[in-house]
């Protein structure tokens, strides 16, 4: 009897580059391609092992002199929103969230462009074109969805794509043990809505409804202001050399009780 074995993934190492989070540090990444019939399975395994997905690439930091990037996942079934998070939910009660297959639109790109121009003018994504955005959304071999968040208007919910202004969107992988937030963006003019927080809360709600345990938020870097928000969602686990361990919010040097 002839049997065919699936080739093991090949891993590669990037050249050193300036770290986007910590000054004077250099970053390197180890990566592999997520293609073929086992792409979804490999994405699950690698994400659970601290990798992140970007298009058809799974990567994780492999820096020579630094271990500051820590993988974070929320324990969705145990999560209870704080008072401030409940206020965010109330503020955004006029938003309707709709899940679609991972397909880009010009409306999405327009909002994405506004977000980049406001938040990441000097970042590596700052010059992304509409084609780059389309590739970011569509180039996936796993179960990827895009969730649109729109201001609710009369008639919303009666059509396949609800009416109302697009305020935010999230590119999300559906995994065997939860949801992984690949990339999210929002209208930067609506700071009072805390749309980034609202999208994470919505992903926790969706994960609970699916009966799954985890929402993956990517990497947290202690001391990086860009990353501080991630430790507000408790309880959560951090990936350590000993495996996933529950994180004590006091270690972040912040008060998360409000």
From Swiss-Prot:
Keyword Cytoplasm in annotation: yes
UniProtKB keywords: Acyltransferase, Cytoplasm, Transferase
Main location: cytoplasm
Pfam families the record matches: ATE_C, ATE_N
GO BP term, pick one: ubiquitin-dependent protein catabolic process via the N-end rule pathway
SUPFAM superfamilies documented for this protein: Acyl-CoA N-acyltransferases (Nat) (SSF55729)
InterPro entries assigned: Acyl_CoA_acyltransferase, Asp_Glu_LeuTrfase, N-end_Aminoacyl_Trfase, N-end_Aminoacyl_Trfase_C, N-end_Aminoacyl_Trfase_N
Enzyme class: transferase
GO molecular function: arginyl-tRNA--protein transferase activity; leucyl-tRNA--protein transferase activity
UniProt key word Cytoplasm: yes
Cellular localization per UniProt: Cytoplasm
Catalytic reactions on record: N-terminal L-glutamyl-[protein] + L-leucyl-tRNA(Leu) = N-terminal L-leucyl-L-glutamyl-[protein] + tRNA(Leu) + H(+); N-terminal L-aspartyl-[protein] + L-leucyl-tRNA(Leu) = N-terminal L-leucyl-L-aspartyl-[protein] + tRNA(Leu) + H(+)
GO terms under cellular component: cytoplasm
E.C. number(s) listed in UniProt: 2.3.2.29
Protein family: Belongs to the R-transferase family. Bpt subfamily.
Protein function: Functions in the N-end rule pathway of protein degradation where it conjugates Leu from its aminoacyl-tRNA to the N-termini of proteins containing an N-terminal aspartate or glutamate.
This protein's name: Aspartate/glutamate leucyltransferase
Species name: Rhizobium rhizogenes (strain K84 / ATCC BAA-868)
């Amino acid at each position: 009897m002839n049997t065919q074995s699936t080739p093991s993934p090949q891993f590669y190492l990037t050249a050193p580059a300036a770290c986007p989070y910590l000054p004077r540090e250099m970053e390197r990444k180890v990566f592999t391609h997520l293609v073929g019939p086992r792409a979804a399975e490999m994405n699950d395994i690698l994400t659970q092992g601290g990798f992140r997905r970007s298009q058809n690439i799974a990567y994780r930091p492999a820096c020579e002199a630094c271990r500051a990037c820590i993988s974070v996942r929320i324990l969705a079934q145990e999560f209870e929103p704080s008072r401030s998070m409940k206020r965010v939910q109330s503020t955004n009660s006029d938003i309707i969230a709709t899940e679609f297959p991972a397909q880009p639109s010009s409306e999405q790109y327009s909002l994405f462009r506004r977000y980049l121009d406001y938040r990441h003018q000097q970042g590596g994504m700052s010059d992304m074109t509409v084609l780059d955005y389309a590739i970011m959304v569509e180039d996936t071999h796993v179960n990827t969805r895009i969730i649109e968040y729109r201001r609710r208007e009369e008639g919303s919910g009666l059509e396949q794509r609800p009416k109302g202004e697009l305020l935010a969107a999230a590119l999300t992988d559906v995994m065997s043990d939860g949801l992984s937030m690949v990339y999210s963006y929002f209208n930067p003019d609506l700071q009072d809505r805390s749309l980034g927080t609202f999208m994470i809360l919505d992903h926790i709600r969706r994960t609970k409804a699916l009966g799954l345990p985890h929402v993956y938020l990517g990497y947290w870097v202690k001391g990086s202001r860009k990353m501080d928000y991630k430790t507000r969602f408790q309880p959560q686990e951090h990936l350590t050399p000993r495996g996933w361990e529950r994180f004590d919010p006091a270690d972040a040097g912040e008060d998360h009780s409000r």
